[in-house]
Amino acid sequence: SDITQVPANKRDMGFVFQNYALFPHMTIFENVAYGLRIRGLSGDALASKVREGLAMVGLGNAEQRYPNQLSGGEQQRVALARVLVLRPKILLMDEPLSNLDAKLRLHMRTEIRRIQQDLRITCLYVTHDQKEALTMSDRIMVMNRGRIEQVGTPMELYEDPATPFVA
């Protein structure tokens, strides 16, 4: 359905930015709790959801730390937890792994895919990394200069590329 007339704060979607966009003056707990507080959650219900979100991304022991005390991978997981506790229908991710080293990127690909499947969230994942796209996606849209070249499963794109660019 068309949501263009729905205010952004009323749309049931989450966004994980390339730079994570964590609040540096807030603890990890407070960062994850932020969206829940905006929605009116407080007390034990809020604490429970925050702890569940941090456990989901393997950071249950980091809630009193600050973003500058975490590695890039840990910060990325906090940004993911902050969105996931809201249980959005759609999750938009803009190159969330681009600032990570190769080993951590591989690990986080697996983690993001696992969480996305466990929670059954539709995810629109923007990447320039072919391996990321092929390993994390059910369907891929390949774009070239703002135009769609092909849409299909990873296998369809790999076995039957529609254009030389897709190949």
Q: Where in the sequence are the language-model features?
A:
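ABC ATPase nucleotide-binding domains
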Residues: 8-14, 18, 22-165
